[in-house]
């Protein structure tokens, strides 16, 4: 390999590094969404805690705090996720509540 070829490879490598730096700074983080549980007058509190523990992996203490927030304030934040994950969690929670004959509703909103 000649010195000229080596210099070309080095220059190309530097140019590629500069290009990848420019590209990576243009990429934005995905928007986050809050997944909410909405209060109703019929869903038992223990079912809400079960949902929070099962679908959002909250421990008992935190699940109870969120459940009380839902109960007293009308809604509570279960977690913050990217759009796809938030949509999936909302769908799973709503389906699980329907399967168990509870009117509990979950929704999502941008953070």
Swiss-Prot record:
Any coiled-coil regions, as ranges: none
Gene Ontology biological process terms from the UniProt entry: protein catabolic process; proteolysis
Subunit structure: Binds to the N-terminal domain of the chaperone ClpA.
Cross-referenced HAMAP family: ClpS (MF_00302)
Function description: Involved in the modulation of the specificity of the ClpAP-mediated ATP-dependent protein degradation.
Family as reported in the entry's similarity comment: Belongs to the ClpS family.
The name this protein goes by in its record: ATP-dependent Clp protease adapter protein ClpS
